Amino acid sequence: AEIAKAVQDGRVDIGIVSGQVDTLGLQSLHFSTDRLVLATSRQHRFAKRKRISFAEILDEDAVGMHPASTLQTFLGQVTERLGKPQKLRIQLTSFDAMCRMIGAGVGVGIVPESAAKRNQATMNLAFIELTEPWSVRERYILTRDQAALPSYAQSLIDHLCQHYAAQAKS
């Protein structure tokens, strides 16, 4: 909601959001779909699993994003509904840092599949699909009026759409 409000107020030209977000009447352009996955070290007991529910991992030591991040806020809401908090051992400011800690065996963590793929070849990581429908996140670009954007902003939108369209085909 904070990103959409910044676009609506004119503080930024473009906002990128994922999941269920009130777009506040702004123009929205779908540009990609990403999935949240469970990341574990390759030695973890869940590493060989294909799918897992979020509730199953709540007894595990966890690595999370910083408390104010959109993802950690969302996961906090999910755990509140489940009535059981995550056992967070450390909270970090980037998915790459999370993957390093997870690969080192500090705990398990929820990361976007795109971040997981970026780090899989160079880190000791396994990724397991989450069974919950909320784990699939649609991503949108928000603007007040896309046609009125400066050329550099339009170029950024074009690049994002082309990049993710090519990535989806591979």
Regions found by a protein language model. Give the residues of each.
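Short secondary-structure boundary segments
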Residues: 19-20, 42, 113-115, 139
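Secondary-structure junction motif
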Residues: 46-47, 61-82, 149-158, 164-168
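Short beta-strand-centered segments that line the small-molecule binding cleft or hinge
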Residues: 1-36, 40, 77, 103-106, ...
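Short helix-initiation/N-cap motifs at beta->coil->alpha
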Residues: 1-5, 91-98
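Short beta-strand and adjacent tight-turn residues that come in two discontinuous sequence segments
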Residues: 12-18, 93, 110-112, 116
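A bilobed periplasmic-binding-protein/Venus flytrap-type ligand-binding module shared by bacterial periplasmic
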Residues: 39-43, 139-149
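Short beta-strand-to-loop elements that line the ligand-binding cleft
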Residues: 18-19, 64-65, 85-94, 129
